Amino acid sequence: ESDGNATFTVTLSEASVEDVTVEYATGSGTATNGTDYTGTTGTLTLSAGVTTGTIVVPITTDTTDESDETATLTLSNPNNATIGDATSDLVITDDDATPAISISDGTTTEGGTATFTASLTNPSSEDITVEYESSSGTATNGSDFNAVTETLTISAGETTATFDVVTTADAKDELDETGTVTLSNPTNATISDNTADLVITDDDTANITIANQTIAEDGIASFPVPMSTTSGGPVTVVYTSSTGASGDNATDGADYPGTTGTLTIPTGSTAGVFTID
């Protein structure tokens, strides 16, 4: 295929004292005129005393992995000679590599759909199939995203195909999570990169609030600190007491002990509490 030209040799059984002419024309077989080769017609002249001549058919180079293909060259209407063998085969040998499949990562916010793209290094004349399967990482297969086990087809002549993985929305504030999609068992291709990450970006935020508290002297003030949603990890918040702006307010360190501390709300909880006495 990469040679660029196919050369046919026309041979006389013996030399002639006169010029010999013969018409020729290409014809399609499994190879396609205009795509795999350039169709050629013309008249070949073998001068008197000459016993051989050549006909050149241009071949088209491509990157498609395909079977070897054929066309024909046919001779007709000779002058000063007869035709012993009118047709010859043009065999175009494919020299393109078997396509290799790779896969790109898919990213989405939770509740969204992650799209994965499988790509070929070069096209094929045949459909290519490859199996894909999801698995857990920090995200749980079947919980944080829909488990998938399917077969993807990349159609003949194409170099990419896509598939989707649907993720599950929740209200938990958590770190971004990942799963894995793995390719296996290709047909008409090899695999160069069989694994891709599914990245699920968290879109939840835990909001913390605190309310005023009223207590009797010598009492203990408990301050609940509720969160709007659970978190995938411990939440810490620093609290500090201070004297109010009005002269009627209690004085930090006199009416109550000045307090500074750190409150930790455990993973999965929606509230914490700290006290001032």
Named regions from a protein language model:
Residues 1-277:
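Short boundary segments that mark the start of a structured unit
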